[in-house]
């Protein structure tokens, strides 16, 4: 595949690319300290090149106190020592480019660490030169300060938080600072204070650090929660839902009043005049389809594609850890809506997994020994045949599964621990709460990459920061590479199909059998070629409806996951791609 884009709407390079996300802490450890590092990634690049991916997305490797595993950054222009040095990074970047791949950095600029020099200076007092780089507000004296709504992180605070917003990580979104007797805003952890993008000095500082990395040779950015950077300056109270302690502030910070202005400014100040090889991806929780069209319209100069979360919230009940069964019709409605909605303008990221999601084969498939391989490859086929740029999260190509967490002491993730503490304090059954964490907790994605059957899965010679899944004895890269029928080789075939079949990249999307609760079916049509994708989302054989079966019975099979076929009946978890020319 050619590396240089040509800029035409249907010919930009990233539309036919496949991205592989690396979570450095858990990918490969070169020095035996139990934590993955840059040298470990460099040593495994041939594996990724053989897989066929085009872009590596590197989760944060900047210096960080690691309160949120690197998404709390204390220095944007260096490398976290446990991952290596800038020299190690430069070697990794050169080795990636030598293999014809690109490297995209994770950019986290909605917030910094509270240990970043910017925030330390801001915290010095109301007269600090950087006070307005963050969202500081005085306490409210006219609100009841008893109970959790006053801010559980600061029970001795003299007044209530400036508004009632809740944090994504449980509790209040405000932290009291005793030194100035004011509160600062943190939509995530108290150690992740939100930057004030209303201040042009903040924006200029962000532009400068982005240019610094691009000048170093990186190929773009995945922008973390980038649609949260614009807040309503009035910071109004959010609506309370049910008996909730905290208000929903999202209408005042999700896709806020100046977010398009800020992204267009980044495009002008950072990317203008640079080669078209660069990629910008915006992670956007809560983004609507209509908003995504604006963000990804090439004529507006904002981002190339978005990460949206609609389809990975379909098995949520009252909240993320209240797990309910997936209804296939809901999944089809969601993915189909985004396919048709971005058909004329815009572009989408295709993903099942990332560092925040549980393993897809455990979530929407069957991770038991009988059906794990077939359900993992079925899910991969469905995703990769949609229109958009596919993302593979490390280990997904092996069919890695959720991990067995026996007790709350086995859980490391700050989000899960915060939810557990709040839920148990509110009187919920601890065992039931833990069941929700087992199903949807972020630690499921963060167990070490399973390289081989040796101790600690070949990830480290030391003690891993998070234990390897015990099933690495059978589910690992060495075994998968050696087995032509493995999940790994199915991913290789899917990637090769995207690189060689224009209908996969550019074809129109048409959903079929929208109300069928067992079969997922759609076509991709480009010029004289039509592809039919059929997938069985159950553990039982399912016949293709007669009309569709008759129309496609003689169409050649392009790709499948269940061996030879002789009839239009899909075996458990089977997927097929047929071609009409």
Model-derived regions, located:
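Active-site and adjacent substrate-binding regions of carbohydrate-active enzymes
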Residues: 2-581
């Amino acid at each position: 595949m050619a590396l240089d884009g040509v800029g035409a709407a249907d010919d930009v390079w990233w539309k036919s690319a496949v991205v592989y996300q690396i979570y450095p802490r858990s990918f490969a450890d070169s020095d035996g300290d139990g934590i993955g590092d840059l040298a470990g990634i460099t040593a495994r690049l041939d594996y990724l090149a053989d897989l066929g991916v085009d872009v590596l997305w590197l989760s944060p490797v900047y210096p960080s106190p690691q309160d949120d595993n690197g998404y709390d950054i204390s220095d944007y222009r260096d490398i976290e020592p446990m991952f290596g040095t800038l020299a190690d990074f430069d070697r990794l970047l050169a080795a990636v480019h030598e293999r014809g791949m690109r490297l995209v950095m994770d950019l986290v600029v909605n917030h910094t660490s509270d240990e970043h020099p910017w925030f330390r200076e801001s915290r010095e007092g109301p007269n600090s030169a950087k006070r307005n780089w963050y969202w500081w507000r005085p306490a409210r004296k006219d609100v009841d300060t008893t109970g959790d709504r006053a801010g559980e992180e600061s029970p001795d605070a003299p007044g209530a938080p400036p508004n009632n917003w809740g944090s994504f990580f449980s509790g209040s979104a405000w932290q009291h600072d005793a030194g100035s007797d004011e509160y600062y805003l943190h939509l995530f952890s108290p150690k992740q204070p939100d930057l004030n993008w209303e201040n042009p000095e903040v924006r200029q500082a962000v532009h400068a650090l982005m240019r610094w990395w691009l000048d170093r040779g990186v190929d773009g950015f995945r922008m973390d929660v980038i649609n949260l950077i614009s807040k309503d300056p009035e910071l109004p109270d959010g609506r309370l839902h049910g008996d909730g302690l905290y208000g929903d502030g999202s209408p005042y910070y999700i896709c806020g009043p100046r977010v398009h202005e800020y992204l267009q400014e980044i495009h002008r100040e950072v990317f203008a005049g640079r080669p078209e090889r660069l990629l910008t991806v915006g992670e956007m929780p809560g983004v609507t389809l209509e908003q995504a069209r604006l963000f990804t319209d090439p004529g507006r100069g904002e981002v190339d594609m978005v990460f949206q979360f609609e389809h990975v919230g379909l098995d949520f009940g009252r909240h993320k850890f209240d797990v309910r069964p997936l209804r296939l019709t809901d999944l089809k409605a969601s993915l189909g809506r985004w396919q048709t909605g971005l058909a004329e303008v815009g572009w989408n990221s295709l993903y099942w997994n990332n560092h925040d999601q549980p393993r897809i084969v455990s979530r929407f498939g069957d991770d038991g020994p009988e059906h794990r391989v077939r359900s993992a490859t079925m899910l991969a086929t469905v995703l990769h045949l949609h229109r958009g740029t596919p993302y593979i999260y490390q280990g997904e190509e092996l069919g890695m599964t959720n991990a067995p967490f026996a007790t709350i002491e086995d859980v490391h993730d700050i989000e899960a621990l915060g939810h557990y503490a709040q839920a148990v304090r509110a009187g919920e059954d601890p065992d039931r709460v833990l069941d929700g964490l087992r199903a949807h907790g972020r630690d499921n994605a963060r167990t070490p990459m399973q390289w081989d059957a040796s101790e600690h899965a070949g990830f480290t010679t030391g003690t891993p920061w998070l234990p390897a899944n015990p099933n690495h004895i059978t589910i690992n890269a060495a075994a998968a590479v050696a087995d032509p029928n493995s999940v790994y080789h199915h991913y290789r075939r899917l990637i090769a199909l995207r690189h060689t079949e224009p209908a996969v990249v550019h074809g129109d999307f048409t959903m079929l059998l929208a109300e069928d609760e067992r079969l997922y079916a759609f076509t991709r049509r480009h010029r004289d070629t039509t592809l039919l994708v059929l997938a069985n989302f159950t553990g039982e054989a399912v016949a293709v409806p007669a009309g569709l079966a008759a129309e496609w019975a003689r169409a050649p099979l392009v790709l499948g996951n269940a061996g030879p076929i002789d009839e239009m009946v899909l075996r458990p978890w089977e997927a097929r791609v047929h071609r009409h020319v």
